[in-house]
Amino acid sequence: MYSLTTTRYFLRRAKKFFKKHPDLKQAFEDLVEDLRHDPFQPHFEYHHLGGKLEGVQAVSLTRSYRVTLTIVLTEKEIILLDIGTHDEVYGKR
């Protein structure tokens, strides 16, 4: 099982995100629980990012919302970095 860590930035973004989208809180909790068991399940649409987000990965919360993260395989740790719409997370504002 993977351990889970968050950044301060993620906590601020998540607080704002769930204030706007309280209906997605359960989906996020389910996603996190599934990630902890196996972060490479196909339904996450797990993918590596490029450009200024090189070295970061992303998974889908819903069709419209993404969670960016880093997975440290040697330590079995997942670090949550950001949550939001595709454009918010990938910096296209």
Predicted regions and their residues:
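A short, surface-exposed loop/turn module that caps and links secondary-structure elements
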Residues: 34-59
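Enriched for short, Lys/Arg-rich terminal
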Residues: 12, 25, 61-66, 70-93
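Arg/Lys-rich, positively charged N-terminal/basic patches that mediate binding to nucleic acids
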Residues: 1-31
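A generic structural signal for beta-strand entry/edge sites
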Residues: 1, 56, 75-77
